[in-house]
UniProtKB/Swiss-Prot annotation:
Active site residues according to the UniProt entry: 180
Gene name per UniProt: WNK7
Name of the protein: Probable serine/threonine-protein kinase WNK7
Lineage start: Eukaryota, Viridiplantae, Streptophyta, Embryophyta, Tracheophyta
Cystine crosslinks: none
EC category name: transferase
């Protein structure tokens, strides 16, 4: 900032054009060494970058200019601007953007500083301009960035906003350098910073806790590596910062990470994105074999779509043409696009899986729970093939996708076989499911909520990822099946479940025939007139039928708890409604004995009217 102190009095007038101006300057610095041209190289929130020229060295430079009124608009903006200049003035490294001079122009009311010029702009724009880049080149960029981070961290500096937009490229040299240190924090005797600031897509989870260290730059570097390899902005599948925040704090990586087919690249990026306690330093990452110049990094196609990509992918592609030719001489039929994603409910130890089938307008989203303790991937995959009429995928292939998602959500999960022979005590051997199961109030239950108390709205059912567009028929108990009796003499109201055993059994049979673990039957199936349909096999008798019925049961603990809670609430409500609730409320507090007799008749009439209102309200709730 010595340059700023040099500016004052008449010396500032030299900031106008000096000499004969054959270079076409718009203005010059106070010393006349640097001249600004009219060409704009970039524009940020606080500053504009112009092309400039250093007459002393005969090289082009970047002229950064900010209007003082804009800088002084907020104290934070002023602090960030001066912090960037002061840091750049103190840092000297071949991976950090070089700083030359700074000053204030009083009459123009601008703050100016000169940095080295990068001919190819930012790394992000450079990468978009040239989509095909070898892994060898990406590894060279990564080594330069890590060396710059190691230099900053050794001096107690956290960048806090490292991203490809803040990394600059000299394309003719293949050289990258770290810039834009406006958000950098200097740890002066403190091991952690305590402010939440940066770009959400590149912010480490611990930054939201407002207590972090230099490891946040390593996390951001991992996201930069992901963008360099995939040419895709991290968390581009999210629509707003709130969704990004939820994913980051939940430890969910961007979808682009799972589209990496290079196992070594995925391993290297994964090291950068682990939790802060296990995250390596920049110096440690420099020793990773992935960055070794001796490695043969000649792969141009880093990104490839696998047949069964790990979730949470929104789409998946079929096998490549080369794999199909090796598998069989005849061209293989196109497989159904399928992706399986999951969401872990840690509170209830339950996993909800989402199956996305097809693409475009024909996409189908199906949600169902997976009980880690009782379900197996192979059983669920077999049921999916039968229920969803998947003819071009093997159950083993789908089971591998399911198991891969379960392992991602529950790292310690190990696949096992479950015997349904031990479950005879839970299911009726006659084949009749528990009637209370169909009264489940859990909104996430795939079968209980379909056949339980509900509305006939065709808008769909809420799933773990939002609304499921199931505009198809499903079973429910209408409100008329719950009756309310009113006794005028006793002024009591009672609620009773007036569903007969025979009608309940018929409804259960209809529900069992039209829905399963994977959701309700399709509309086309309901029009077949009772016959079998493409998505469901014919009914089988004996042990196999009982086994299939047991498989379709939702074994999720959340459903069991919601069922018990629902039954407890119904029983408690039935008990309380047998008492004179309205009258009891009226009798609370002091009551004049002399007025009791005169108001008994009117009070009794009022209680009858109130009781009718309360009963109607309970009827509406159920």
């Amino acid at each position: 900032m010595s340059g700023a102190r040099r500016c004052g009095g008449r010396t500032s007038e030299r900031s106008s054009v000096v000499g004969d101006n054959r270079n076409g300057y718009v203005e010059t610095d106070p010393t006349g060494r640097y001249g600004r041209l009219s060409e704009v190289l970039g524009k940020g929130a606080m500053k504009t970058v112009y092309r400039g020229f250093d007459e002393l060295r005969g090289v082009e430079v970047a002229w950064n200019q900010a209007t003082i009124s804009d800088v002084l608009r907020t104290p934070d903006a002023l602090h960030r601007m001066y912090a960037e200049v002061s840091l750049l003035a103190d840092l000297r490294h071949d991976a950090i953007i070089a700083f030359h001079a700074s000053w204030v122009h009083p009459s123009r009311r601008t703050f100016n500083f000169i940095t080295e010029l990068f001919s190819s702009g930012t790394l992000r724009s450079y990468r978009l301009r040239y989509p095909r880049v070898s892994r060898r080149a990406v590894a060279a960029w990564a080594r330069a960035i890590l060396r710059g981070l190691a230099y900053l961290h050794a001096r107690g500096v956290i960048h806090r906003d490292l991203k490809c937009d803040n990394i600059f490229v000299n394309g003719h040299l293949g050289q990258v350098k770290i810039g834009d240190l406006g958000l950098a924090a200097v740890l002066r005797g403190c091991a952690s910073a305590r402010s939440v600031i940066g770009t959400p897509e590149f912010m480490a989870p611990e930054m939201y806790d407002e207590c972090y260290g230099v490891g946040v730059d390593v996390y951001s570097f991992g996201m930069c590596m992901l963008e360099m390899l995939t040419n895709e902005y991290p968390y581009s599948e999210c629509d707003n910062p709130a969704q990004i925040y939820k994913k980051v704090t939940a430890g969910k990586l961007p979808d682009a990470f799972y589209r990496l087919t290079d196992a070594d690249a995925r391993r290297f990026i994964g090291r950068c994105l682990v939790d802060a306690a296990h995250r390596p330093s920049a110096e440690e990452l420099l020793l990773d074999p992935f960055l070794s110049p001796s490695q043969n990094h000649d792969d141009h196609n880093i990104i490839a779509h696998a047949t069964a990509p790990p979730p949470p992918l929104p789409l998946a592609c079929s096998n490549s043409s080369e794999e199909q030719e090796e598998a069989a001489p005849a061209p293989a039929a196109k497989t159904t696009d399928m992706a399986i994603t999951g969401k872990l409910n840690k509170e209830h130890d339950t996993i909800f899986l989402k199956v996305q089938i097809g693409g475009g307008r024909n996409v189908r989203n199906i949600y169902f729970p997976f009980d880690v303790a009782n379900d197996t991937a192979m059983e669920v995959a077999t049921e999916m093939v039968k229920e969803l009429d998947i003819a071009d995928r093997e159950p083993t292939e789908i089971a591998a996708m399911i198991e891969q998602e379960i392992v991602r959500l529950v790292p310690g999960y190990k696949q096992h076989e479950y015997s349904y022979a031990d479950d005879n005590d839970d299911d009726d051997v006659s084949g009749h499911p528990n009637p209370f199961y169909y009264l489940s109030s859990s909104p996430t239950s795939s079968q209980g909520s379909l056949c339980g108390v509900g509305s006939t709205s065709s808008e769909g059912f809420p799933g773990p990822h939002g609304k499921v567009d199931w505009s198809r028929d499903y079973c429910y108990y209408p409100p008329s099946s719950v009756s309310v009796s009113d006794d005028d003499d006793s002024s009591t109201s009672s609620l009773s479940a007036a569903v007969s055993a025979s009608s309940l059994h018929q409804q259960q049979q209809h529900c069992s025939a039209s829905s399963s673990r994977l959701g309700p039957a399709s509309a086309s199936a309901s029009e077949d007139g009772g016959g079998g349909h493409a998505g469901r096999p014919r009914q089988r008798e004996g042990e196999e039928e009982r086994r299939r019925r047991r498989m379709s049961r939702n074994r999720s603990m959340v459903d069991m708890r919601s069922q018990l809670l629902h039954r407890t609430l119904v029983e408690e409500l039935n008990k309380r409604l047998f008492f004179n609730t309205v009258g009891a409320v009226h009798d609370i507090g002091f009551r004049d004995p002399t007025a009791a007799a005169s108001s008994s008749s009117s009070s009794s009439h009022h209680r009858r009217r109130s009781s009718n209102k309360i009963d109607h309200k309970h009827h509406y709730m159920f």
